[in-house]
Amino acid sequence: MKLKRILLSVALLCGIGTTAMADKGMWLLNELNQQNYERMKELGFKLSPEQLYSLGQPSVASAVVIFGGGCTGITVSNEGLIFTNHHCGFGAIQSQSTVDHDYLRDGFRSNNHVEELPIPGLSVRYLREIVDVTPRIEAAVKGAKSEMERMQIIEELSQKINAEYTKGSTVVGEVTPYYAGNKYYVVVYNVFQDVRLVMAPPSSVGKFGGDTDNWMWTRHTGDFSVFRVYADANNNPALYSQNNKPYKPISYAPVSLNGYREGDYAMTIGFPGSTNRYLTSWGVEDVVNNENSPRIEVRGIKQAIWKEAMEADQATRIKYASKYAQSSNYWKNSIGMNRGLKNLDVVNRKRAEEKAFEAWIAKNNSQSTYGHILPGLKADYAKSAAISKDINYLYETLWGGTEIVRLARDVNSVGRIQAADMPKYKGRLEELYKDYLPSLDVKVLPAMLDIVRQRVSADCQPDIFKFIDKKFKGSTEKYAQYVFEKSIVPYADKVKDFLNLPADKQKKILDKDPAVALFNSVLPAIMQAQDKSEEMMLNIEKGKREYFAASRIMDPNRQMPSDANFTMRMSYGSIKGYAPKDGAWYNYYTTEQGVFEKQDPTSSEFAVQPEILSLLRSKDFGQYGVGDHLRLCFLSDNDITGGNSGSPVFNGNGELIGLAFDGNWEAMSGDIEFEPDLQRTISVDIRYVLFMIDKWAKMPHLIKELNLVKGDQRDLMPAGKGGNCSHKKAQTCAKKECSKGKKCAEKSATCISAMKDGKPCKTEKACAAGQKSAEKKANCCSTMKDGKPCTGDKDCAKSGKACCGKNKEAAAKKASKK
């Protein structure tokens, strides 16, 4: 450990990256440049660009899918088998669960295709095509006189372009902005709507650790679930039919049993949802104060009410499990983000960037071109602060907090439903009521109303408070009881009867319904608040667009990947642990031992079924084990955010080694500021997934369906066998370079940081022991006159003699005297 620390210190002094340093960013595969690719090869990537990404052809990326409405998945067999996270499949598993068949608690396994469960409403999307439509957008907006007009033009043209690429419900085109609105692509997908549940572990595995461990390392969660995509007889996307057959994909991922070592190449491909890496300091403050803070307060109160009821009743737990998980995920994310932004002093980092931008403007006499950008953003953020906070409080409380307002919206829309659409409308309502409890929501409503009264500006509050004050003397609890006693909206049976009435009778009932009255008060309040903020928000978007474009001109060599927007991206890096704080170090993997250390039968988050504990205790890990242990989760320094859940993690050969499911607590600020020393992706080891499928679910037919890759196990490779080189400070290297006991491997961590010119060490001689070793040359960085890396003999000392030759000690003494 001490030697590693010394090496790292030398590398930092030299200003040369180590092999384990990822490139910041979520890269567009269709824009992958030579610089990216060369760096990927340095880190250990072995495939060609075409093998990585080639739409319509077999490639690594062709097997990656959008799973549902906000996750990623990976195709792993020639019969449409999909691996994704347990929390991504959680809603699907919950939808099939009952008290008698509790698949959340007990897990699910199918013995054949017939037993696989269709999931209504679930879809999987395969990327079909990406087309640059920027010229069409730019030509259309050229004459726009305002940001509002510009937005309307883009929206209308986008709808037209979408229609050009969309074919029914199975091929969908979506125009999407990139680079802060400076570029536009239409992204086209094949949409498969017959997706079936194949296998899911018990929640004690798939959700082990619950909210306590969410966003945390160490982790011991088997966060995976298994689905299958079905297609019609011609292998085309289709709606559900018993006649459909398993989909034959263009590509599917090989699954590696060979493991990984620290420093090994790791790559994720997925659909990250949203990042804001190019915000100004005022934008960061807006996120902290006006977005995250309302979310933290409101969801904390709502979730406490839900949790008490869920722990008291099994049926309630099943109904609200998915809702609670979705709510708490971003509640804890917001807490961690605010903490991280403060700890990393991100606001002042952004201010430093702004000062550099202003200095560049002054140096280039560009005040007339760019001088308005930052002052405009500062002013617009200041104007929008109060209304932004009001909007977020209204959304979190009365729109997203209590459920009755949106139910009232749906019931109230009955008059606009055409006869042909009525069956679909009734089916949607039935799904909503299936997981709704009026007895619980009646407790949430007054809590949400109280927050609105306390936090939202008086002129933005819904006028329902006048009624509450007049009739109930301000008591929100009495008002809530009144709503739930007098309204038909909270009760599925009453709504069902209501839908069978003539239209005139329906209107009379709705006109008098107190829940509908609440909806008719809340909606205008939100819309009015949005109207007030719209111009300011559009001006902010304009400023962000201009700031991004100008920043690229200021520093044309700076790599500025587009922010995430739920389109396909790649992140490359290495398997790597991290230091969460001074004096602490987190290992890069966990094992089954941690389950025994954490498990607690008295805790709903850490209770594990005896059969699972017995299975792990038996150590019958077979081909999935590492010695007498089973690796459960691991870390890599890939870039991750929401939407990446379920993203495949590939090794340098394009083989699946894990499924990404989380980020770490110390780097929750990563959506705004990527911190390479801290930011880590948490993934479930694919061998834990296979172990549960094989040994727990006893589904050998699924294991046979996979393309398993077996070879030398990376985890156990000794020195000289493709693991640690025999060179005393080398960390990783290619097998062929170390198989004969060479002291140095091509592109090893030591040699990259050690060579005078920064290039990889390619020969044994370059790393041999003695005065001329690359290892020793690294020490010369400290003898530089200006403290910068040694790049030539003249730079090292005043004498101008050799950087690391016989005069090394003399050079060092001269430098120290200076």
Curated annotation (Swiss-Prot):
Gene3D superfamilies: Trypsin-like serine proteases. Keywords: Aminopeptidase, Hydrolase, Protease, Serine protease, Signal. It comes from the Bacteria. The active site is at 87 (charge relay system), 223 (charge relay system), 645 (charge relay system). InterPro entries: Pep_S46, Peptidase_S1_PA, Peptidase_S1_PA_chymotrypsin. Belongs to the peptidase S46 family. This is Dipeptidyl-peptidase 7. It comes from Porphyromonas endodontalis (strain ATCC 35406 / DSM 24491 / JCM 8526 / CCUG 16442 / BCRC 14492 / NCTC 13058 / HG 370). The gene is dpp7.
